[in-house]
């Protein structure tokens, strides 16, 4: 199988983008893993697929696959790359497009300064809808938020649980660079209280409108930036009374700006940040390569 692809990144969160709008693209999880493999494939945190929508009133369908081959609900950094890709590829000349994601629709707008503004939707804090199992736990209130105790390697971490269309667990730490993200991240990601696993966010408060953030992403590990993770962290910080919008989010890959008016019911978060094309190419992806990679990773 020969595939044309575009390699892109949003604040260092990198993607293989495929045009499934003008050609059929049907990949197995093993083939997704092969494309995302940094040694034998193109290499990426996620694979993004552009398709024709299956619902009325939208321009495109936006699908996201993690580097482990699993399909996920949302990716904010990928959304910015998505709108740049469809414009650069000539699939649309609109500055603003409405796209179908796994849970609903979002609006993406290319701004005059080259950054992309993404309507990320309204954050959800109901544990059942994240989902997060609270049975037997006693939460504690902080501002308008509820923090939940989570046993992580024998230590209790107090977390906010948020859905941005995908699940997030956010905790505040004193020094995000010194914190053992690579130790605690995978434990939180697969914690039994998150039945669909979770993205683990570690937020350091720099000021009332500025944070540093690291995210250990579900199915991808720590990435240089996570758009939904930035939104979840800012939403949790505002609800806890720690932050005021707009908030500048520093990630290892770059800066994002998140705006949210928590006082208004059902108000969406808005995320602004960069999107860049790295290169375009074509790759031969025989079934044997995908199978060999799948076997080597399972060994």
From Swiss-Prot:
<dbReference type="GO" id="GO:0008837">
    <property type="term" value="F:diaminopimelate epimerase activity"/>
</dbReference>
<dbReference type="GO" id="GO:0009089">
    <property type="term" value="P:lysine biosynthetic process via diaminopimelate"/>
</dbReference>
<feature type="active site" description="Proton acceptor">
    <location>
        <position position="226"/>
    </location>
</feature>
<keyword id="KW-0028">Amino-acid biosynthesis</keyword>
<comment type="subunit">
    <text>Homodimer.</text>
</comment>
<feature type="site" description="Could be important to modulate the pK values of the two catalytic cysteine residues">
    <location>
        <position position="217"/>
    </location>
</feature>
<dbReference type="InterPro" id="IPR018510">
    <property type="entry name" value="DAP_epimerase_AS"/>
</dbReference>
<keyword id="KW-0963">Cytoplasm</keyword>
<dbReference type="Pfam" id="PF01678">
    <property type="entry name" value="DAP_epimerase"/>
</dbReference>
<feature type="binding site">
    <location>
        <position position="199"/>
    </location>
    <ligand>
        <name>substrate</name>
    </ligand>
</feature>
<feature type="binding site">
    <location>
        <position position="166"/>
    </location>
    <ligand>
        <name>substrate</name>
    </ligand>
</feature>
<keyword id="KW-0413">Isomerase</keyword>
<feature type="site" description="Could be important to modulate the pK values of the two catalytic cysteine residues">
    <location>
        <position position="168"/>
    </location>
</feature>
<feature type="binding site">
    <location>
        <position position="46"/>
    </location>
    <ligand>
        <name>substrate</name>
    </ligand>
</feature>
<feature type="binding site">
    <location>
        <begin position="227"/>
        <end position="228"/>
    </location>
    <ligand>
        <name>substrate</name>
    </ligand>
</feature>
<feature type="binding site">
    <location>
        <begin position="217"/>
        <end position="218"/>
    </location>
    <ligand>
        <name>substrate</name>
    </ligand>
</feature>
<feature type="binding site">
    <location>
        <position position="66"/>
    </location>
    <ligand>
        <name>substrate</name>
    </ligand>
</feature>
<comment type="pathway">
    <text>Amino-acid biosynthesis; L-lysine biosynthesis via DAP pathway; DL-2,6-diaminopimelate from LL-2,6-diaminopimelate: step 1/1.</text>
</comment>
<dbReference type="GO" id="GO:0005829">
    <property type="term" value="C:cytosol"/>
</dbReference>
<comment type="function">
    <text>Catalyzes the stereoinversion of LL-2,6-diaminopimelate (L,L-DAP) to meso-diaminopimelate (meso-DAP), a precursor of L-lysine and an essential component of the bacterial peptidoglycan.</text>
</comment>
<feature type="active site" description="Proton donor">
    <location>
        <position position="75"/>
    </location>
</feature>
<keyword id="KW-0457">Lysine biosynthesis</keyword>
<comment type="similarity">
    <text>Belongs to the diaminopimelate epimerase family.</text>
</comment>
<dbReference type="InterPro" id="IPR001653">
    <property type="entry name" value="DAP_epimerase_DapF"/>
</dbReference>
<feature type="binding site">
    <location>
        <begin position="76"/>
        <end position="77"/>
    </location>
    <ligand>
        <name>substrate</name>
    </ligand>
</feature>
<feature type="binding site">
    <location>
        <position position="13"/>
    </location>
    <ligand>
        <name>substrate</name>
    </ligand>
</feature>
<protein>
    <recommendedName>
        <fullName>Diaminopimelate epimerase</fullName>
        <ecNumber>5.1.1.7</ecNumber>
    </recommendedName>
</protein>
